[in-house]
Each structure stands twice: as C-alpha cells, then as structure tokens.
C-alpha cells in the first residue's frame, strides 16, 4: 500500500517526513485546490528532506483550460522540476466541454519523461469518466488522482472500485479527497485501490492549514494493517 501525503508548505513536508511518509504531492494554496509551489520549496524537499516529491504543476486556481502563455509557464515548471530531481509531475487538462485535452496531456507526459505523470483531480470534472480513463491511459499517464467523481473518495467508492477494475495494470488509481485514518481501511478494502492520497491537515493557531504529523502516523499505521 502506497501512501501519498499532500503538503502545501515546506513545514508540512517536514512534518510528513517526521511522521514516516516517503512520498508527497507538493503544492501551495491548498485551500484553492493547489497551485505550483516555489522552486526553493521543491529543492528543499528533494535535497534536505529526501522525499519522493510529486510536484503539482498548475499556474492558477479555477478551471483546467489554459491559454498558451499559461502552458508555456507550465512547460518551464516541468523542465525546472526535472532538473531539481522530482519523482513525479502532477497535471490535468480539460476542454471547455469537460472532455480530456489529450493533445496537451500527451505533450506533457512526453516533456516530463522519464519522470512519471499523474493526471490530477481535473479527472473528477470530466463528463465521461470511462472514456476519459482510456484517454488518460493512451496519453501515457501513470496515475490518476481521483475521488471517483464525487466530493470525497468515500462518496465516490463505487466509481473508484469500477475504475480499479477497468484500469487493471495499465494505470494506477490513486484515491484522494477526505481520506483519513478512520476510513482508509474501508476505502481500500471496498475499492481495491493500491495507493491513497491524504492531506492529514489541521488549522494552526496562525490561521493556516498544515500537515499534522500525528494524523500522518495514524494514516500510515492503519493503512499498513490492511490485508487483501
């Protein structure tokens, strides 16, 4: 069972590391769905914390339809993140009608190679998830981060289960959104996912969210006891 902790700052990443996490998705502005983190933060996570860092490449909040200026920025982000030694790139592209932008998705998997690409929760906004699954696979992505097209993974567990069955060994279904220590066993057992994604966040006295080491410890512990 692989666990990915979503971290929105260098301190959150350090907390996840201290709790035993090996892999993180790194972003900033988590409350807005996440945007691309600073290069310094990426560098610290890779070189000082020695984590497997999957970097979210998203230039702004909002929809997943980008203009050429934004796309060029994202391409440069990917190039720099590869130079910094990241373990994965996380992106997602849609057309206005909610279909997968396959041309852009393929363009970014080729640019990122040999670094693997995760297609993020833009997938949950697609209009036809079965068709979209096949398109994302054909574009060369290695993972799909999804809640089963529902607000949380538990609410989307029926779709997640079907996604796992349809995907087989062709792509990894990474279940995320609302994954907690108290529901991870039920989610994994029911859906058959082999990887889960959780933020394990709490609000600090400073009024911002941060990854909670105790929650990460509990999530890792409960996930480690799952038997198939």
Question: What label would you give each PLM region?
Answer:
Residues 3-5, 24-26, 53-57, 89-91, ...:
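Hydrophobic faces of well-ordered beta-strands that scaffold small-molecule active sites
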Residues 8-15, 65-77, 124-139, 163-167, ...:
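Catalytic cores of alpha/beta
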Residues 9, 30, 59-61, 95, ...:
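Active-site-proximal loop/turn and secondary-structure-junction residues that shape catalytic pockets
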Residues 10-12, 35, 42-102:
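Active-site beta->alpha loop and helix N-cap motifs at the rims of alpha/beta catalytic domains
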Residues 17-18, 42-54, 79-85, 107-112, ...:
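Acidic (Asp/Glu)-rich catalytic clusters
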Residues 23-35, 80, 84-96, 141-154, ...:
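Glycine-rich phosphate-binding active-site loops on the catalytic face of alpha/beta enzymes
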Residues 34-61, 100-122, 155-181, 213-228:
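Alpha-helix-loop-beta-strand connector modules within alpha/beta enzyme cores
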Residues 82-134, 139:
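Hydrophobic, well-structured mid-protein blocks that either form specific transmembrane helices
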């Amino acid at each position: 069972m692989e666990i990915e902790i979503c971290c929105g700052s260098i301190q959150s990443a350090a907390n996840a590391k201290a709790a035993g996490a090996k892999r993180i998705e790194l972003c900033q502005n988590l409350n807005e769905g996440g945007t691309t983190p600073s290069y310094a933060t990426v560098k610290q996570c890779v070189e000082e914390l020695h984590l497997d860092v999957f970097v979210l490449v998203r230039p702004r909040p909002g929809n997943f339809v980008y203009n050429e200026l934004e796309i060029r920025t994202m391409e440069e982000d990917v190039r720099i993140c590869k130079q910094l030694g990241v373990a994965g790139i996380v992106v997602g592209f849609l057309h206005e009608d909610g279909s997968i932008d396959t041309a852009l998705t393929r363009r970014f998997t080729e640019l990122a190679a040999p670094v693997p690409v995760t297609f993020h929760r833009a997938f949950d906004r697609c209009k036809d998830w079965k068709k979209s699954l096949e398109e994302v696979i054909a574009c060369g992505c290695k993972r799909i981060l999804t809640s089963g097209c529902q607000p949380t993974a538990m609410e989307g567990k029926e779709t997640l289960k079907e996604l796992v069955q349809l995907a087989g060994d062709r792509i990894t279904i990474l279940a995320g959104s609302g994954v907690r220590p108290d529901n991870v066993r039920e989610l994994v057992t029911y859906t058959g996912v082999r990887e889960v994604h959780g933020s394990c966040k709490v609000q600090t006295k400073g009024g911002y969210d941060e990854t909670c080491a105790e929650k990460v410890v509990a999530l890792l512990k409960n996930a480690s006891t799952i038997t198939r």
